[in-house]
Amino acid sequence: MPGNLSFKDRVVVITGAGGGLGKVYALAYASRGAKVVVNDLGGTLGGSGHNSKAADLVVDEIKKAGGIAVANYDSVNENGEKIIETAIKEFGRVDVLINNAGILRDVSFAKMTEREFASVVDVHLTGGYKLSRAAWPYMRSQKFGRIINTASPAGLFGNFGQANYSAAKMGLVGLAETLAKEGAKYNINVNSIAPLARSRMTENVLPPHILKQLGPEKIVPLVLYLTHESTKVSNSIFELAAGFFGQLRWERSSGQIFNPDPKTYTPEAILNKWKEITDYRDKPFNKTQHPYQLSDYNDLITKAKKLPPNEQGSVKIKSLCNKVVVVTGAGGGLGKSHAIWFARYGAKVVVNDIKDPFSVVEEINKLYGEGTAIPDSHDVVTEAPLIIQTAISKFQRVDILVNNAGILRDKSFLKMKDEEWFAVLKVHLFSTFSLSKAVWPIFTKQKSGFIINTTSTSGIYGNFGQANYAAAKAAILGFSKTIALEGAKRGIIVNVIAPHAETAMTKTIFSEKELSNHFDASQVSPLVVLLASEELQKYSGRRVIGQLFEVGGGWCGQTRWQRSSGYVSIKETIEPEEIKENWNHITDFSRNTINPSSTEESSMATLQAVQKAHSSKELDDGLFKYTTKDCILYNLGLGCTSKELKYTYENDPDFQVLPTFAVIPFMQATATLAMDNLVDNFNYAMLLHGEQYFKLCTPTMPSNGTLKTLAKPLQVLDKNGKAALVVGGFETYDIKTKKLIAYNEGSFFIRGAHVPPEKEVRDGKRAKFAVQNFEVPHGKVPDFEAEISTNKDQAALYRLSGDFNPLHIDPTLAKAVKFPTPILHGLCTLGISAKALFEHYGPYEELKVRFTNVVFPGDTLKVKAWKQGSVVVFQTIDTTRNVIVLDNAAVKLSQAKSKL
């Protein structure tokens, strides 16, 4: 038996185990002595059909290897309890449950049907509930249990075309967080994983070269470790792929407190302090936290009430005048408060409440004029389109939707019944889907609209006795993240709030202290009004889309994900013992954390970490070895042909590598700059190569040799908290002669990164030529022009010189980062331009460029140059798209040989 983490006689239930990740789980557990229930319905990826063969084949494979297993063919959402019954009947207990079964119904939200939404939620989320609920009494009585819920990056961050899947997967996180809290005293550990693994569900989405690294075998070791009897980890979330293992946790900003008096606690007051709400620095009244529960609102409101009246700032919220707002569950509590506040700002309000919308309408119309508000008593679950039709019939439009309606059916998980699960899911999650779906075509046609969805701290952090509510509210968050992505292209703004207020619904769970502090709904509504305003988008500094805010008691804060630096294993076979040995690295939040906000950011950061680990192994000696073959390959990558023998034939008497080959050892050494250590929240996916400079320290680049490049940071600067600038200096030496061959400076702009004061570097000595500005002389005819056609396959060829970033070859990845096709390497564009200058003006000693736009392989480039003494200022234009791609650019000619 491999390793020392034994599962001998433990009973493990795995759903969706007929193939992919589930199958690998089953084989791994069985190999370590577990008795395995292999569940698989045997349907298609879309969930149709039924075939017992898949589960039977896995069981046969386990038995042939000497293991113990039985098959089960039940549906997780229809007969989940029967899967657990199989374990009890065959083996007498259940110790480990892996909720892994899933289906996909990917389609844009505009085209998604309620059936497509419900089917995915049923299999993933309700299936997870059904299995966990059936296993719970056995695990409690045993005082032992381990449950893994399988989430997804799509659930954590949203993903285009997966509103159903995102909702279901994030719902599983909320469920797991609650079960972890309820199970703690019974030794039941519950965790969530968000794997990026090769499976039936991913093989049609991810490109082949990435899929090669994403074997499900790289996921299993963490799950084995988390479910072992010796492991105490619970209530945690992990991202993992291709040998990378990292932990995710919530990060809540210190936010801002306001005097909660509604006279001055207004949307304007919040806008005036927006920067403070969304920054993550500690403040005297509150610290940035990594919580497992809601804020200490009692402390915050006590401090807030001592503040003077709130400053209103210079911006008045006027954009809501005559806008039409639909607020659900507005007969009292938060909904009523929202409706009144919108009316106060000039909006027309549809007050929806299944019981009594009329008294609120009467109150609003008395305050703000007849016809300001109208009632609607349709059911949010079954009659969502009719609610929106009420708005259209009366006001001919709808601009804002606030999904607020809700119910509670709180019970400990042991006592929770299916009807209580479904009732809460329907009112919260399914009504949010249906109402958002009903306004979507209207907002799309208008090219504008706002949706504010309501989650809960129970959904974010889990809460004892609220498995149904936590799952529904977490699912709303995942759903909102996806429709925010899809809506952004249509002018539809979606955001999410987690309110803390005393209402009829929350009175039953509030403490005496909370009730005495009077957390009025009016302490939430000003933020809701602001989120529905155009002023926020205009004056906040960056668009506010798909964001999560916690609010109440005069306090507003933002909540986001934070990921640990993590651990990467580069071994072909990873064992859970390796996970155990490196647990401190996996859960290390002390350095190199990131705050991924999208699936692309997260996945790119993961794959970059893996690539860096592999590169570090390959470049342990830090040496760059090359031959004439590499020189020819580089020259060909810049467009040299067989007619240019001095560039393409090693026996030509004038054979040489083009001078810009100096950037190749620089590029190979950029990883040694360790930008992830220099800045906070480094994400490779957000890195832009801004400028490049190099100086040749020998008359020509050698055509073969062994070089070593030493890197050091010259500047590390914060750019207003929105980005970081890193400038690195790179000295390249010949190992044999010890002579300096070339010196490079690269400037990198990392969006979303931050540089705290203690990490700033300002005093690095820059090359004089690198920091000069070179403006093209306007109105003056260029001394030299050259038009160069790039080749459709140029990026495919140039990448063989060492830059294997898939962005330059993989259409799927290019589209994921918003490019229609793969782009040409910026250093290739530099090399093509510099070759034209080299052939016209002769050798140069120094070169500096700024990258201002991308080039697509096959585009035509025009190089324009103006000679000014020993300096040639130039500019490169992509004439196919009529954009400048290289600017602020110049070469300094060599005095000895240049064609002056």
From Swiss-Prot:
Limits of the MaoC-like domain: 775-887
Short motif Microbody targeting signal, span: 898-900
Catalytic activity entry: a (3R)-3-hydroxyacyl-CoA = a (2E)-enoyl-CoA + H2O; a (3R)-3-hydroxyacyl-CoA + NAD(+) = a 3-oxoacyl-CoA + NADH + H(+)
Region: Short-chain dehydrogenase like 1, residue numbers: 6-230
Family annotation (InterPro entries): HotDog_dom_sf, MaoC-like_dom, MFE-2_N, NAD(P)-bd_dom_sf, Peroxisomal_Beta-Oxidation, Sc_DH/Rdtase_CS, SDR_fam
Record-level GO BP terms: fatty acid beta-oxidation
Subunit structure: Monomer.
UniProt domain comment: Contains two SDR domains.
Cited function: Second trifunctional enzyme acting on the beta-oxidation pathway for fatty acids, possessing hydratase-dehydrogenase-epimerase activities. Converts trans-2-enoyl-CoA via D-3-hydroxyacyl-CoA to 3-ketoacyl-CoA.
PANTHER family: DEHYDROGENASES, SHORT CHAIN, SCP2 DOMAIN-CONTAINING PROTEIN
Family under the similarity heading: Belongs to the short-chain dehydrogenases/reductases (SDR) family.
Name this polypeptide is given: Peroxisomal hydratase-dehydrogenase-epimerase
